[in-house]
UniProtKB/Swiss-Prot annotation:
The lineage of its organism: Eukaryota, Fungi, Dikarya, Ascomycota, Pezizomycotina. One of its GO terms (cellular component) is mitochondrial inner membrane. This is Mitochondrial glycine transporter. GO terms for molecular function: glycine transmembrane transporter activity. It comes from Pyricularia oryzae (strain 70-15 / ATCC MYA-4617 / FGSC 8958) (Rice blast fungus). It is a multi-pass membrane protein. GO terms for biological process: glycine import into mitochondrion; heme biosynthetic process. Pfam families: Mito_carr. Keywords: Membrane, Mitochondrion, Mitochondrion inner membrane, Repeat, Transmembrane, Transmembrane helix, Transport. Signal peptide: none annotated.
Amino acid sequence: MSDGTSKSGSKSSFHFVAGLGSGVLSAALLQPIDLLKTRVQQSPHQNILRTVSEIRHTSPAGLRGLWRGTVPSALRTGFGSALYFSTLNAIRQAAVPLFAHDAAVTTSPNGGNFANNKNNSSRLVKLSNTGNLLAGGVARGFAGFVLMPLTVIKVRYESSLYSYRSIAGAAGDILRTEGPRGFFAGFGATALRDAPYAGLYVLLYEQFKRRLGGVVSSSAAPETNEDNRMGVSRAAAVNFSSGVLAAVACSVVSNPFDAVKTRIQLRPGRYRNMVVAARTMMAEEGARSFFSGLGLRMSRKALSSALAWTLYEELIMRAEVGWSLSSSRTERAM
């Protein structure tokens, strides 16, 4: 294998590792919010306070029961983030000739381009709005399909409708009662929720970064690093704020699909598919049921997305600096 190919492979692998680390951390920290969302969505009569009270009084672990399902959630979110970020990076690199952003860019050691100015808080590839929308949607759809079995197990394990004692027990019961198809229950609703969400998220995230970066740079004292980019602390603040704003906007748009998906995964016998689930929910509970758990989901999405993207961007930024220094030393030695 050539040295160039080896370096390219290691850099692609680093996007996977960076995504894995950021995903596991955010999942572990925010599992209580995810569990509460699942419990609230499983019944029209549930609310946050009642759910917390039930967990506190009925769970053998007390309030530690809020972390029930952390392992499948961390596995799903961790490997989902790893697969998503590495796939997204590959798609964005390949899409540069078709959807390159029209701003002045500099070639990065990772093979793409990034804006090289004091308003920029990122070293990720810069694409047009259309490019970001398509890249985010395709990457999320692919990652969602691969990780769907873990998603189903996670939702069932978190729900109070099932008394699974272990992840293996949950997987065995699903396989025994529903067959392999049971591991993909709700994939249609999940894909319709996640692919547009991810595409719109990447688009808005990049837009917010560009606009907030300009505001921060123009309203504060200069803080740039050696390559004239925004300083680390301000870059992290811009990235985190952009992640929160993008997640809030996307959560509102995609929540109906999330509510439908949860019903299908929890009660596949009653809610056989998206159409049946949507009709039943509308007839029995009204339009409000499609926004059940919105506050919890919005909170979790805002925090998890912002944490994951900020940590991912920071890891990639540090890696890019290391690769640049390594390349410079190699060139001087030749």
